[in-house]
């Protein structure tokens, strides 16, 4: 067994990739090697020791998850055959289930969601499946539809001299996994991170495993606020922040006057927006369907399977 395969097995990713009742899948061992290169860069830049393996498998370990082939480890997403390929559809929210009659063009909701969605997807092209899901704000992706792209960088103020991370004020408006992990690393590097949540829509990970929420958000200050009635307080925080991280639809911030364009620029401030798809800011994306869009799936004997957890 070569070192990359052994590392994949030892990390727990093999346990999370492959058919439910079959052997683990080793077709994506290079993913962990690349993740280790990325985390080594983070350690070099911040001084924070980061191990890629628990970052990729930690949630599954906390929740006792395992591989389920074309059902995501978390259970909310399916890899489904379409008339011309494969697609992923995610139904993690109550709103997604309520939208199924519109998706399936039926008068009543299906008694069992996934058999009905699977039968519907099989009759349509991947492009048609994704397009209709997008209309209803359901996360969906065709296998391999997305290609790698570089972040879009726009300068709206003067640059500033480089600063150490420790002592920076970070306003974290993100939720779930990607953004909170980013700000967790900044907090570990010494930044003062303020996790901002709406009373009306708190971080969705609060509804899941409490230990996962705690893991992603330890070391941060917590600030719950009414996004519709406490605009001035939010603007003050954004104006004071050295780093802003958000993952909402641009319109959600813009209509409240809280977007990067609405807050006066300041030399050295970094405003990071996390989106699922370049050039499609309103498109919903979660981890498992986004991975399928990028082609990050295991190569099962009879078709693709989910790779790891989200």
Report the location of each language-model feature.
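Short hydrophobic-aromatic micro-motifs
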Residues: 79-91, 222-225
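Charged, structured surface patches that assemble and position nucleic-acid processing machinery
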Residues: 142
């Amino acid at each position: 067994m070569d070192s990359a395969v052994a590392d994949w097995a030892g990390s727990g990713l093999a346990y999370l990739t492959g058919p439910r009742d079959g052997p683990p899948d080793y077709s994506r061992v290079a993913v962990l090697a690349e993740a280790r290169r990325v985390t080594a860069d983070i350690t070099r830049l911040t001084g924070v020791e980061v191990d890629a393996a628990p970052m990729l498998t930690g949630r599954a370990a906390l929740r006792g998850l395992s591989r389920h082939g074309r059902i995501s480890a978390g259970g909310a997403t399916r890899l489904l055959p379409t008339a011309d390929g494969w697609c992923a559809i995610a139904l993690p929210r109550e709103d997604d289930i309520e939208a199924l009659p519109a998706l399936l063009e039926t008068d009543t909701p299906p008694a069992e969601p996934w058999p009905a969605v699977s039968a519907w997807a099989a009759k349509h092209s991947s492009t048609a499946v994704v397009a209709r899901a997008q209309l209803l704000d359901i996360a969906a992706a065709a296998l391999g539809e997305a290609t790698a792209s570089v972040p879009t960088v726009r300068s709206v103020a003067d640059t500033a001299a480089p600063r150490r991370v420790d002592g920076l004020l970070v306003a974290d408006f993100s939720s779930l996994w990607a953004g909170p992990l980013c700000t967790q690393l900044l907090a570990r590097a010494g930044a003062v991170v303020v996790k901002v949540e709406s009373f009306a829509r708190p971080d969705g990970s609060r509804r899941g495993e409490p230990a996962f929420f705690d893991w992603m958000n330890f070391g941060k200050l917590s600030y719950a606020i009414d996004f519709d009635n406490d605009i001035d307080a939010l603007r003050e925080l954004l104006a004071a922040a050295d780093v802003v991280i958000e993952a909402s639809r641009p319109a959600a911030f813009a209509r409240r006057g809280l977007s990067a364009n609405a807050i006066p620029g300041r030399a050295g401030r970094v405003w990071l927006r996390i989106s699922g798809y370049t050039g499609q800011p309103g498109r919903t994306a979660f981890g498992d369907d986004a991975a399928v869009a990028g082609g990050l799936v295991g190569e099962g004997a009879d078709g693709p399977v989910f790779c790891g957890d989200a």
